UniProtKB/Swiss-Prot annotation:
Cellular component aspect of the GO annotation: signal recognition particle
Protein name, as recorded: Signal recognition particle 54 kDa protein
Taxonomic lineage: Archaea, Methanobacteriati, Methanobacteriota, Thermococci, Thermococcales
Gene name, Swiss-Prot/TrEMBL: srp54
InterPro entries: AAA+_ATPase, P-loop_NTPase, Signal_recog_part_SRP54_M_sf, Signal_recog_particl_SRP54_hlx, Signal_recog_particle_SRP54_M, SRP/SRP_N, SRP54, SRP54_GTPase_dom
A GO biological process held by the record: SRP-dependent cotranslational protein targeting to membrane
Entry GO MF terms: 7S RNA binding; ATP hydrolysis activity; GTP binding; GTPase activity
Note on domains (UniProt): Composed of three domains: the N-terminal N domain, which is responsible for interactions with the ribosome, the central G domain, which binds GTP, and the C-terminal M domain, which binds the RNA and the signal sequence of the RNC.
Coiled-coil segments on the chain, per record: none
E.C. designation(s): 3.6.5.4
Statement: the UniProt record of this protein carries the keyword DNA-binding: no
Pfam families: SRP54 (PF00448), SRP54_N (PF02881), SRP_SPB (PF02978)
Protein family membership: Belongs to the GTP-binding SRP family. SRP54 subfamily.
SUPFAM superfamilies associated with the record: Domain of the SRP/SRP receptor G-proteins, P-loop containing nucleoside triphosphate hydrolases, Signal peptide-binding domain
GTP-binding recorded as keyword: yes
Length: 448
């Protein structure tokens, strides 16, 4: 997940609260100091940190929990609510109201703008929109080929001409090209040659006059931390229809600083980049984001990922029911492992399940992902009968499977043990239990 270290530090503070024998003023102040340290290490502005934690401490000391809720649970709820408010409270989804809707993207050099354009195009395509992408980056000819490489596999057309030096002309011709083709959304990738806000905004103004976009999106590099405030503020003042994508949140200790800095300007954050895969772009919802950050899960996000796979006929509903009941064989397990890999990294999935977010060390998760790939190779060496009836796999079959897959007999036995454990685990981790875990804190942002 984005902001891994910040999430672990905040989760650690809440665990300290949960383990404490009493909840007095000293305990609350200690937890607040832990939260302050976590936020400052994530490059969140000192003034913002002090404002936030002062409010958390004030509420924790003054408020009485409602009937049936413990003091500890109420304090966790206060932390959740204040962090959510800190990052903007409500989600601000991208609206596609016109046909075609024209979106202009701008960003400082190195912000991850071109990759974000490809991710946004894919995101919209998966939601049923016909998308065209215009590359008007005349400063970096490689941008056109980069977009082609990313989007050709998905059948998303990229309009561009690496030889053309007039960015405004390219943008105008590209938009006209896709209007004639009747697409739903046109995304224009502008040049990322500027290293400061003034030049960026001037280019945005020129291209905007030429193509009249319905939405202008600024792409901000999450690794710059609280410096993002200046970019976001300059952008907000320059355009009344602006929104923001914050990128590279998966690999930066300063991501919290960038998110909080942008939120402080009031400019709407609509998406965040959470990884290198083309599908690693997610709508920014402060409630669900903070819920995952605190280790409280995101059931709605998990179910949405499953629904996406269902639409792509990779993850049938009846298969999911078998999975949750523990009534599945190795053939089902193989199909589900393939589908789960398409949902994203294992760590991201675990963080959507309440209580599992930070329970496994990073090394263990990485080893787990490698083992999943190994298990698929082993299952490829099994017969159809063995996949459908794992109970018939005896020692002689284990030896044959090991030889065929280049594995050891111990690895094959390990796979079979994992299969049996997964049956038990998913049988106990049914939807009702997940909902109960999430409802414990009565958080509206969990979507339950």
């Amino acid at each position: 997940m984005a902001l891994e270290k910040l999430g672990q530090a905040l989760n650690s503070a809440l665990k300290k609260l949960a383990r404490s024998s009493t909840v007095d003023e000293a305990t609350i102040k200690e937890i607040v100091r832990d939260i302050q340290r976590a936020l400052l290490q994530a490059d969140v502005n000192v003034k913002l940190v002090l404002q936030l934690t002062k409010q958390i401490q004030k509420r924790a000391l003054e408020e009485e929990p409602p009937a049936g809720v413990s003091k500890k649970e109420h304090i966790i709820k206060i932390v959740y609510e204040e962090l959510t408010k800190f990052l903007g409270t409500e989600a601000k989804p991208l609206e596609i109201k016109h046909k075609p809707t024209v979106i202009l993207t701008v960003g400082i050099q190195g912000s991850g703008k071109t990759t974000s354009v490809a991710k946004l195009a894919r995101y919209l395509q998966k939601r049923g929109y016909k998308v065209g992408v215009v590359c008007s980056d005349t400063w970096r000819p490689g941008a056109y080929y980069q977009l082609r490489q990313l989007l050709d596999p998905f059948g998303i057309e990229v309009f561009g001409d690496p030889e053309e030096k007039d960015a405004v002309k390219l943008a105008r011709e590209g938009v006209e090209h896709f209007r004639e083709k009747g697409v739903d959304v046109i995304i224009v990738d502008s040049a990322g040659r500027h290293k400061e806000e003034k030049g960026l905004i001037e280019e945005m103004r020129q291209i905007s006059e030429a193509i009249k976009p319905h939405e202008v999106i600024l792409v901000i590099d999450g690794t710059i931390g609280q410096q993002a405030y200046n970019q976001a503020m300059a952008f907000k003042e320059a355009t009344p229809i602006g929104s923001i994508i914050v990128t590279k949140l998966d690999g930066s200790a300063k991501g919290g600083g960038a998110l909080s800095a942008v939120a402080a300007t009031g400019a709407p954050i609509k998406f965040i980049g959470t990884g290198e895969r083309i599908d690693d772009l997610e709508p920014f919802d402060p409630k669900r984001f903070v819920s995952r950050l605190l280790g409280l899960g995101d059931i709605q996000g998990l179910l949405e990922k499953i629904e996406e796979l269902q639409k792509e006929q990779e993850f049938r509903e009846e298969d999911m029911e078998k999975f949750l009941r523990g009534k599945f064989n190795l053939k089902d397990m193989y199909a589900q492992l393939e589908a789960m890999q398409k949902m994203g990294p294992l760590k991201q999935i675990l963080q959507m399940i309440p209580g599992l977010g930070y329970s496994l060390p990073e090394d263990a998760v990485r080893v787990g992902e490698e083992k999943l790939k190994r298990y698929k190779v082993i299952m490829d060496s099994m017969t159809e009968e063995e996949l459908e009836n794992p109970e018939i796999i005896n020692y002689s079959r284990i030896k044959r499977i090991a030889r065929g897959s280049g594995a050891t007999t111990a690895e094959v036995r390990e796979l079979l043990n994992q299969y049996n454990q997964m049956k038990k685990m998913f049988k106990s981790l049914n939807k009702r239990k997940l909902a109960k875990m999430a409802k414990k804190f009565n958080f509206g942002g969990l979507g339950i």
